[in-house]
C-alpha cells in the first residue's frame, strides 16, 4: 500500500491552515510514519505535483490522501477522520 498526502501551498507561499492542522494530527498520532509521500499543490503553479494529482482524482480541496494498492482502484480521502478510521485503524 502507498499513501500520498497532498498539501496546499497558498499563493503567498504559506501552507493552508487545515493542512497545518492535519500535519499536526498526523505527527501527534504517529501516523505520519505511514505516509509514503507528501506533495504540494501550489496555487501559483497549476503543474505542481499536487495540482496534477488533484485534477487526476477530481479533488478541489486540500489536504487530501490517496491510498493505492496493487490491483485496486485508488481511494481518495478529503476528510482526515474518515482516512484515519478506514485506513489507519481498520
Regions found by a protein language model. Give the residues of each.
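Generic hydrophobic, helix-prone segments enriched in Leu/Val/Ile
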Residues: 34-35, 52, 84
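Local sequence-structure signature of Cys/Sec-based thiol-disulfide redox active-site neighborhoods
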Residues: 1-37
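Generic alpha-helical propensity signal that fires on short helical segments
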Residues: 21-23, 53-56, 77
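General "foldedness" signal
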Residues: 17-19, 40, 52, 68, ...
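Acidic, low-complexity intrinsically disordered segments
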Residues: 62-66
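Thioredoxin-like thiol-disulfide oxidoreductase module
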Residues: 39-61, 88-90
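Broad hydrophobic/π-residue packing in well-ordered secondary structure
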Residues: 6, 57, 78-80
Amino acid at each position: 500500500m502507498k499513501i500520498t498526502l497532498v498539501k496546499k501551498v497558498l499563493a503567498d507561499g504559506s501552507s493552508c491552515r487545515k493542512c497545518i492542522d492535519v500535519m499536526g494530527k498526523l505527527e501527534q498520532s504517529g501516523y505520519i510514519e505511514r505516509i509514503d509521500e507528501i506533495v504540494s499543490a501550489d496555487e501559483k503553479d497549476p503543474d505542481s505535483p499536487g495540482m496534477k494529482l488533484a485534477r487526476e482524482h477530481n479533488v478541489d480541496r486540500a489536504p487530501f490522501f490517496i491510498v493505492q494498492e496493487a490491483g485496486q482502484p485508488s481511494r481518495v480521502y478529503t476528510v482526515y477522520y474518515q482516512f484515519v478510521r478506514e485506513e489507519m485503524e481498520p
